[in-house]
């Protein structure tokens, strides 16, 4: 019983630290749990062609970092700001295929004042350290606008 209590305490502490903005990286399972609880907005920064192949994490919002030429879209920061209703302190987590673009986008958004932003660094497919959203069998939804 004591082990169960200790495990629950550690889980709650992990969720609290992830939601409070203390760390910049967050695991896919933790991000999913926080998003399900309404404490975190997940933003998928991959391209629509990628969303079409795998679907988007559920729950999440798709806001592509890049245009079709793989250049950073000028409207990306404004689209993220719209997604959080102008609240740069709202907890958000970014995800891409394997952590590269999401890490870059975290830095970009921090530079313009976002304060509670996390990187789901394992991405959809894994990054060599963790298996990724899909390997965890976390839910995805078809892209309706692709």
Question: Residues of each region from the PLM?
Answer:
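Rhodanese-like catalytic fold shared by cysteine-dependent sulfurtransferases
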Residues: 17-37, 52-91, 100-146
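Short hydrophobic beta-strand that contains or immediately precedes a catalytic carboxylate
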Residues: 41-45
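Short glycine-rich anion-binding loops that position phosphate/pyrophosphate groups of nucleotides
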Residues: 48
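Bacterial N-terminal signal peptides
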Residues: 5-17
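Short, surface-exposed ligand- or partner-binding patches at beta-edge/loop junctions that are enriched
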Residues: 94-96
